[in-house]
Amino acid sequence: MNQQPIFIIEDDPDFAEIYQKHLTRYFPEIPQQVFYNAIEANAAFSELSEEELPSLIILDILLTGPDGFTLLNELLSYPETSQIPVLLISSLNLGQMSLQAYNVRAILNKETFTPADFVTKIKDILSPATKTSLANHLETTEASNEESIPGRTLQAKEGNHA
């Protein structure tokens, strides 16, 4: 069985590269896929079978086009994606309690986190207990017998390029 990938959703190529380097160094067995906006990521989710879903989403909130909150709401609306753990990385001051409904497992401040913080959070999220919980959720949703996740609705808003 192939290892489930980690999805990196980050519009800054420099930060995306930093995340990839740390993932490759500390988690070489886990494939990664980078998306530079929420629309690309959402399109990828719509083409994946449940077995191909990521084990973790590393998500920047302030994305160009639809933001990370828009993507989180979209993921939450489908049983197949609602339980994927999320590591938020943002320069915004976000409270953990308000984000638990989105399956956010940890938040790192983009301006102050260290490589050790990044690796520790990922190890915590991908611990065997967490993986077992996610696997159990995926088994229960397999009863739907769908080959892929139903079509997504996330679209760019005109003039929204912030």
Question: Which role does the model predict for each range below?
Answer:
Residues 34-56:
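Acidic, metal-coordinating helix/loop segments flanking the phosphotransfer/catalytic sites
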Residues 64:
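The feature encodes the CheY-like receiver
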Residues 13-37:
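Two-component/phosphorelay signaling modules centered on CheY-like receiver
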Residues 10:
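Conserved acidic carboxylate
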Residues 87-89, 110:
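Hydrophobic/aromatic residues positioned on beta-strands within the core alpha/beta folds
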Residues 59-61:
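Active-site residues of response regulator receiver
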Residues 115, 129-162:
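CheY-like receiver
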